[in-house]
Amino acid sequence: MANTASAEKRNRQAQKRRARNVQVRTGVKSAVKKLREAIAKGDPAATQVALKSAEKTIGKAASKGVLHKNAASRKISRLAKAAAKPAAAAK
């Protein structure tokens, strides 16, 4: 429990930030899930749309500081690699 007014304010601010960060992280998870489902279906057009959406969502999360930029880059790289694998196998 906060003892001072400034500590109470910091607690309120932290709760607001946490709620915002959780929302952003949830969006990232949803975008990644949609991409993985598109990859599993084997639809190249849907996969490309989902990949673009996931990249955008992850990039925004990194720019807001929710994800570290290197972690975001690693996620995007791995997702792009996974999305490219079925396309390469089809050729």
UniProtKB/Swiss-Prot annotation:
Stored Pfam families: Ribosomal_S20p (PF01649)
Molecular functions (GO terms): small ribosomal subunit rRNA binding; structural constituent of ribosome
Keywords associated with the record: Ribonucleoprotein, Ribosomal protein, RNA-binding, rRNA-binding
Keyword Protein biosynthesis: no
Recorded superkingdom: Bacteria
One Gene Ontology term, aspect cellular component: small ribosomal subunit
GO BP: translation
Name of the featured protein: Small ribosomal subunit protein bS20
UniProt-annotated stretches for the region Disordered: 1-28
HAMAP family linked: Ribosomal_bS20 (MF_00500)
UniProt keyword rRNA-binding present: yes
Protein species of origin: Anaeromyxobacter sp. (strain K)
Protein function: Binds directly to 16S ribosomal RNA.
Record PANTHER family: 30S RIBOSOMAL PROTEIN S20, SMALL RIBOSOMAL SUBUNIT PROTEIN BS20C
Gene from which the chain derives: rpsT
Similarity comment: Belongs to the bacterial ribosomal protein bS20 family.
